[in-house]
Structures are given as C-alpha cells and as structure tokens.
Amino acid sequence: MIFTGTANTRLAVDVVNHLDMSLGKMTVGRFSDGEVMVEINENVRGKDVFVLQPTCAPTNDNLMEIMVMVDALRRASAGRITAAIPYFGYARQDRRPRSARVAISAKVVANMLQVAGVDRVLTMDLHADQIQGFFDIPVDNIYAGPILLGDIWRRNFSNLVVVSPDIGGVVRARALAKQLEADLAIIDKRRPRANVSEVMNIIGEVDGRTCIIMDDMVDTAGTLCKAAQALKDRGAGAVYAYCTHPVLSGGAIERIETSSLDELVVTDTIPLSEQGQACGKIRQLSCAALLGETILRISNAESVSSLFAD
C-alpha cells in the first residue's frame, strides 16, 4: 500500500500508476491553527505500507506531515512502514564543521523518523552518504543516475566533457564520465559563506566542447550559473547541467533564465513551481518508474542494488 502527503502528490500518482495500483485512502489536512491532521480511511492492519513524501519546502510542514502520517499508520497496526523520501531535507546539516556550536540536523531527523515508527527508509541521491549511518534501521539510497544518463545518451552529444562543480562531486562526475567514455574537468571554487560561491579555476580542457555538469541538487543556482559562465569564458561550446533535486530557492529560477547555462535537467523528486515550469531552460524528467520498481522490490524482498549493477 502506498500513501502520500501533500508535498508531491503528482509523483505519488505517477508511481502508483506505474505499479497499476491505487493510492491508499488517507485524509491529510490542517486544523484552524495550522496543526497537521491525518486520518487513515481504510484498513492497514498487518499491511506493508509505504509513505511517499519528500521533505522539500515548506520543509518543516512536510516533515511534520510524514511524522504524523507514520504515527497514524503505526497506531492503525500497519505491519511495516517504509518512509519513501525522494528528497531528504536537512541532509546538508550532517556534521559540525570546525567544532562550531551547531546542530547535526540530519541526525535529528533520523531520530524523529525512527521514534515515529518508521521501519525502513527509501531515499534518492542523499546529499551525504554517511547519513545512512545516522539510522538504526535499513536505508535504501537509490540513484537517479540511470534516468539522467539515459537522457544524455538519447541526446547523442558530441565532444563531451563531464564537469564536477566542486572537489566533493568528483566521484559522481568521474563515474558518469566513465559510463559516457568522456573526459573529466573539475571546477575549483571557494565559498566564503553559505549560499555564496566564487569560481576560481577550471582543471581540464573544455575549449570547444559540450560540458555536462552533474550534481545532486541545485538550490540557489549561484554555483551553477557561475560555473556555466566560467566554462563559457574558457571556450565551452555548450553547458548543460543535470541535477537530481530541483530545490531552486530564492532567485534561482531568474538566475538560471539569465545565465550562460544552455539547459538545466532535473527530476521530479521535488515539484517545480509554476515559475519553474515556465522557465525555458529547465526540463524535468520523471523518477516514478525507478521509485515504483524499487518499492516493488523492497515489498517482495528482492535485490535493490541489482537495479544499478551496471
């Protein structure tokens, strides 16, 4: 059985359509003071239940929704509850940098999900793989790579070079470059403060080439747009970005529209706003089939890793 909150209903509908089933019957609403109200409208006793809800903006509302949904299902005697969180919010707060007096919020969220009654977590392209270790329950972190790679293959780009937007993304970019039999370039940037970045240097040959920037998410798009400009300044023929999660906060969409970026390709782990849908440089791919197949395999106790064996 698959239930969903209000964060990304379209994706949930696409997933159940792929599986040729119907969404579970659940009422999710708000009391007059804004508190979340959830009621399960069918029998779930002993059932294998999946709750599909990304914790995207409004992050705290969507996070509270999934907590209350899980609690309602647990109290209704669901047999096993899997929190399917395509985009895992708070994942960027996964450590204490330089002993700063800050929370490790990713761990807080992991604790909350387990206390609420989640038995297993399914997510996609976690910002930091080590977050899986914050849980004492199984975590399946699947990858949008096959979706994004398939789109690149279909477009039959020539003279490709895969670009890592920073040093931390080199492993992801190198894996893509290997699959595409393409060269690798790296952008060395310095980030003076949160959500502000400055492109400093490009390592690799990009002159006259089609550049593919691969990242797990695009937030304010400051890094992405500066990277595209730096690549064009170095003679790149075209710059395309492939990012799993379209967070697109602040003035990201306007920034992308006026940037040197030729196109941004994202998945639907997070729904695009009307402004995002209207942006001619943003294109969205569906991850419903991949999520649906993963849910089916988890429910049938089959291998998930074999989906990504190649």
From Swiss-Prot:
Cofactor note: Binds 2 Mg(2+) ions per subunit.
Residues bound to ATP: 33-35, 92-93
Enzyme Commission code(s) on record: 2.7.6.1
Residues annotated as binding Mg(2+) 2: 166
Any one GO cellular component localisation term in the record: cytoplasm
Keywords: ATP-binding, Cytoplasm, Kinase, Magnesium, Metal-binding, Nucleotide biosynthesis, Nucleotide-binding, Transferase
GO biological process, one term: ribonucleoside monophosphate biosynthetic process
The keyword Metal-binding belongs to this UniProt entry's keyword annotation: yes
Positions that bind Mg(2+) 1: 127
PROSITE patterns cross-referenced by the UniProt entry: PRPP_SYNTHASE
Subcellular compartments: Cytoplasm
A Gene Ontology molecular function term of the record: ribose phosphate diphosphokinase activity
Keyword Lyase: no
Main location per the UniProt record: cytoplasm
Catalytic activity as recorded in UniProt: D-ribose 5-phosphate + ATP = 5-phospho-alpha-D-ribose 1-diphosphate + AMP + H(+)
Cofactor(s) needed by this chain: Mg(2+)
Active site: 189
Enzyme kind, highest EC tier: transferase
Binding locations of D-ribose 5-phosphate: 191, 215, 219-223
One Pfam family it belongs to: Pribosyltran_N
Pathway given in the UniProt record: Metabolic intermediate biosynthesis; 5-phospho-alpha-D-ribose 1-diphosphate biosynthesis; 5-phospho-alpha-D-ribose 1-diphosphate from D-ribose 5-phosphate (route I): step 1/1
Protein family (similarity comment): Belongs to the ribose-phosphate pyrophosphokinase family. Class I subfamily.
Assembly notes: Homohexamer.
Role, per record: Involved in the biosynthesis of the central metabolite phospho-alpha-D-ribosyl-1-pyrophosphate (PRPP) via the transfer of pyrophosphoryl group from ATP to 1-hydroxyl of ribose-5-phosphate (Rib-5-P).
Protein name: Ribose-phosphate pyrophosphokinase
Encoding gene per record: prs
